[in-house]
Amino acid sequence: MVSGSGIAAKRVVVDARHHMLGRLASIVAKELLNGQKVVIVRSEEICISGGLVRQKMKYLRFLRKRMNTKPSHGPIHCAPSKIFWRTVRGMIPHKTKRGEHALARLKVYEGIPPPFDKQKRLVVPDALKVLRLQKGHKYCLLGQLSSEVGWNYYDTIKELEKKRKERSQVVYERKKQLNKLRVKAEQVAQEKLGSQLDILAPVKY
């Protein structure tokens, strides 16, 4: 994803792990308005500056808005994907046709569901915690905050992510072994061909 200048691809998959919520949302909102399709994965690991207790109290005050007919059915969802989606919506003129179409180009997920687990994932340097948050400053994860205010799937997502990482490690080890065998085969072939490679070198074969 190219921030602020042009469309990089048909669809960009962004790994949101350890990105700052507001900074990532502002960059994504700008890209959506430029026509870019964006998929956000691992939204439960987005960071918010400030300690967990402070953020929980702020969010609970925000969640006090309820329906009169059914108080448990408030207008605000507590899942990390919905919190990020709502943050981006606040940065887009979503009541216009342009804003409505821009918001439709955004997909947000907890964890990394198929088929995005096998696709190349990008990061946004301008929103990374390690570059944007001062050293020693408190922060909390969006998944932790959501689990404190009513989201029930934090442990489920962590378990699914653990299984996905185990599968990825098996694939990586297999690929590394195949690369070793390929390098060894190339060395054996070079030793066998020897002088023939010197003849083929001038014609760039």
From Swiss-Prot:
Please give the Gene Ontology molecular function terms for this protein: mRNA binding; structural constituent of ribosome
* Gene Ontology terms describing biological process: negative regulation of translation; translation
Q: Does the keyword Ribonucleoprotein apply?
A: yes
Keywords from the UniProt entry: Ribonucleoprotein, Ribosomal protein
Cite a GO CC annotation. cytosolic large ribosomal subunit
HAMAP family linked: Ribosomal_uL13
State the family it belongs to: Belongs to the universal ribosomal protein uL13 family.
- The protein here is known as Large ribosomal subunit protein uL13
